[in-house]
């Protein structure tokens, strides 16, 4: 069993080429058409696991941490932390739900540890599904609802007509169980 966290394009390539059985991605209005075409071209299927409204991940000590809901205007003074997408530096492949945001301060990172360290050290933020596990990530990063009227569909991709291994099935079951209680 290998768990890799990588760029969106690599996830699609890895599943298409058989390096990975599964990939976890999200679809929303700005990337769905492009990614769906890629799935079809690579003989992949997308299976929705859950829907989520956008949230921000911030430090528990962030100046906005006591807000129940955070607006884009309130976030403008703080660094927007986004994952680098390498050669496919297109917002269609962005890891962040709202990569289309035009924020005055942007920092690209390659991994979650760096992103969380900068969120804590610089009062930065990133936009995501809101799903965060305190057992895995600690209690320094919290999730707050972002005041936006849109939805993301989080799901998995796999090769069409593939028989999944017991590890893949167990992983899917764990994800579904965890996201059902979040």
Predicted regions and their residues:
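Secondary-structure junction motif
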Residues: 32-33, 64-65, 72, 76-100, ...
């Amino acid at each position: 069993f290998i768990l890799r966290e990588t760029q969106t394009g690599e996830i699609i390539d890895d599943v298409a080429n058989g390096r990975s059985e599964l990939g976890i991605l999200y679809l929303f209005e700005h990337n769905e058409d492009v990614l769906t075409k890629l799935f079809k071209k690579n003989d992949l299927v997308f299976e929705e696991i859950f829907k989520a409204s956008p949230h921000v991940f911030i430090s528990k000590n962030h100046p906005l941490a006591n807000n129940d809901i955070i607006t884009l205007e309130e976030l403008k003074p703080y660094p927007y932390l986004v994952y680098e997408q390498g050669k496919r530096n297109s917002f269609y492949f962005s890891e962040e739900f709202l990569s289309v945001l035009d924020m005055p301060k942007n920092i690209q990172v390659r991994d979650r540890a760096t992103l969380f360290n900068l969120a804590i050290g610089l009062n930065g933020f990133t936009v995501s599904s809101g799903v965060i596990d305190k057992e895995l990530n600690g209690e320094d990063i919290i999730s707050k609802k972002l005041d936006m009227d849109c939805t993301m569909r989080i799901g998995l991709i796999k090769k069409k007509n593939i028989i999944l291994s017991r590890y893949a099935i167990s992983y899917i079951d764990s994800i579904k169980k965890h996201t059902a209680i979040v």
